[in-house]
Amino acid sequence: MADRDSGSEQGGAALGSGGSLGHPGSGSGSGGGGGGGGGGGGSGGGGGAPGGLQHETQELASKRVDIQNKRFYLDVKQNAKGRFLKIAEVGAGGNKSRLTLSMSVAVEFRDYLGDFIEHYAQLGPSQPPDLAQAQDEPRRALKSEFLVRENRKYYMDLKENQRGRFLRIRQTVNRGPGLGSTQGQTIALPAQGLIEFRDALAKLIDDYGVEEEPAELPEGTSLTVDNKRFFFDVGSNKYGVFMRVSEVKPTYRNSITVPYKVWAKFGHTFCKYSEEMKKIQEKQREKRAACEQLHQQQQQQQEETTAATLLLQGEEEGEED
């Protein structure tokens, strides 16, 4: 896609038309005017909030950031599935684009913004507008990153066109096997406002990002067998507590994740096979001992037979003399 249509004034019209925005806490008339259909944007087409009907979603906080001729709204919301962040861009023509992030993804996104801010600060001056406008072909991104979390993908590209430098953020949602990905949602942040946007996001994360205290979990451990090392690490996510068992060799690493609810079954299974192997090994030892005893008996019988034969031969030779 050429850079000239990367901004949301054009891209947002095609990608973000699934309802109007609601920002009860915004301080501008234009923001309040879009507030009438806020719930529809939360659960409708577009990126889609993480589930829930309009009356089930509660807005906890809202911030507005004005950058050039665009308005950006950052809304922290909560429904039965937890807290999430909606980022909406409203262009000069009223075109809207919106992204939906879980709070954990918002934390990672904030950190990526810091990287883009640092990279942008180290760049030289932009190309002259007439030269940039003369180049119709798409230009390579100045810096790119992407995030993949569950069924959502986020693509971040620091780019430049005749209007200047901007951070383009695109979100796609995978609806499941056979359903493919939905049409992406895209916003474009002018580079001059990245710091202000990042600071507003960081404030919301500080105030609303932690919903509960981290779970108290056992410390990890490890053991070494021959040239392998096994690591046992306990963690947790929204699905519950789990143990990650990793097998590490100098040139190889593999791991499995075991949910807490089957630890007892895993332990019982290991103990069962441990006992069975003990019995098998005991039988093998008994069999080897029996074979060794039989071999010794056969060897002893052979020695006795050989001795008796030699004795008989000696007696026969004596009688002949």
Curated annotation (Swiss-Prot):
UniProt GO BP: cell population proliferation; dendritic transport of messenger ribonucleoprotein complex; epithelial cell proliferation; lymphocyte proliferation; negative regulation of DNA-binding transcription factor activity; negative regulation of DNA-templated transcription; negative regulation of transcription by RNA polymerase II; nervous system development
Region described as Disordered: spans on this chain: 1-54, 294-321
Pfam families reported for this sequence: PurA
Modified residues (N-acetylalanine): 2
Biased composition (Gly residues): 9-51
GO MF, one example: mRNA regulatory element binding translation repressor activity
Keyword field contains Nucleotide-binding: no
Modified residues (Phosphoserine): 181
Subcellular location per the Swiss-Prot or TrEMBL entry: Nucleus
Complexes and interactors: Homodimer, heterodimer with PURB and heterotrimer with PURB and YBX1/Y-box protein 1. Interacts with FMR1; this interaction occurs in association with polyribosome.
Function: This is a probable transcription activator that specifically binds the purine-rich single strand of the PUR element located upstream of the c-Myc gene. May play a role in the initiation of DNA replication and in recombination.
Similarity section: Belongs to the PUR DNA-binding protein family.
Protein's name according to its UniProt entry: Transcriptional activator protein Pur-alpha
Source organism of the structure: Mus musculus
Gene symbol of the encoding locus: Pura
